[in-house]
């Protein structure tokens, strides 16, 4: 890989999507080859899997099914979109990657981080981000943001109770500790302008 693979992680309502939308034009103006994408999704097959995963009526979905669907979507997205871009020397900004599975399915769903990590090692052939930025926020604050965003479609995970979202954050904090060599924790409970500045500095430090 010649490019730089940067993933943005965080609980629901942490501001990942808004952040990436702001980072994209900044790096384009710097004449950096840059691409934004998301998980699950980014390509047709993975977007179809995303639809299944997010359907509100699929509350009966079992945790292992959920974990495997995310891994399947990740595999196709990686080989079809991310890897070609990295090989073409792009800065790839990805909304979620493996760490989401570790926090949500591994920890919050109780499948075990090691088991979920092994599933994803198989799916990605050990491809890991060069840098991960974790946007940390209290679940109550993130969910309140979602409730105020009339344009955001509520998905199946949003409907989980507050205890689930608290476990997700606990899981993320464990992931940050486990992979401290590549993950930078950033406080997401601050004005977006300041958040953008802080994240740009982190990425540029890595680029240099």
From Swiss-Prot:
Residues binding ATP: 10-17
InterPro entries xrefs: P-loop_NTPase, Thymidylate_kin-like_dom, Thymidylate_kin_CS, Thymidylate_kinase
Key words, A-Z: ATP-binding, Kinase, Nucleotide biosynthesis, Nucleotide-binding, Transferase
UniProt-recorded Gene Ontology molecular function terms: ATP binding; dTMP kinase activity
Entry's EC annotation: 2.7.4.9
GO BP: any one term: dTDP biosynthetic process
Catalytic activity: dTMP + ATP = dTDP + ADP
GO cellular component entries: cytosol
Domain of life: Bacteria
Family: Belongs to the thymidylate kinase family.
PANTHER family, sorted: THYMIDYLATE KINASE, UMP-CMP KINASE 2, MITOCHONDRIAL
Entry-linked HAMAP family: Thymidylate_kinase (MF_00165)
NCBIfam families linked to this entry: DTMP_kinase
Function: Phosphorylation of dTMP to form dTDP in both de novo and salvage pathways of dTTP synthesis.
Name the record gives this protein: Thymidylate kinase
